[in-house]
Amino acid sequence: MSDFAPQTAGGKVLWHFTMSLDGFVAGPDHDMTWMQTGISERPGFIQQYVETTGAILGGRRGWDMFPDAGNVYGGDWTGPVFVLTHHPEDAKPADRVTFLNCDVAEAVRIALAAADGRNVEVLSPDIGRQLLERGLIDEIDLHIAPVLLGDGIRLYEHLGGRPIYLHRVGADDPTAEVDVRYRPAAA
């Protein structure tokens, strides 16, 4: 969207993801290779998050698949990373990474304190869902990639849950749907 305003720092809790058009943030087994082919970013995309992010909060399953905290935003961002887990004792230590065994609300409090007035990015579908249900997500920052995965890890999956209505930030009508139009890429 050309009218999309850049992210700003302000001590917000952001649920931040790139998602396939069919709602997956990762393929099966947290596979992320789909993001490395045929997907481009708008200019300045990475830099705005590097500048506004004070801390990262993620989950253990994602961490175990990608345990390189130094590679957040291609290595351009440095700061505290918090990994929420029920078993911190068997986690492999890493620089700037703290493994937490606590409630999600406590994890957010810890991350916000460490973020020093900047934003906390939540990079876990499950943790994000729990925080959203508790009213602890300030914004959902979502980037829709022009790809259909068909299987994998959904951004939001809460079978039997109630709908959660959202307001679009910066829109004249915050309840308006977002229209996108794609065509299949040539093989």
Regions found by a protein language model. Give the residues of each.
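Enzymes that bind and transform nitrogen-containing heteroaromatic metabolites
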Residues: 1-187
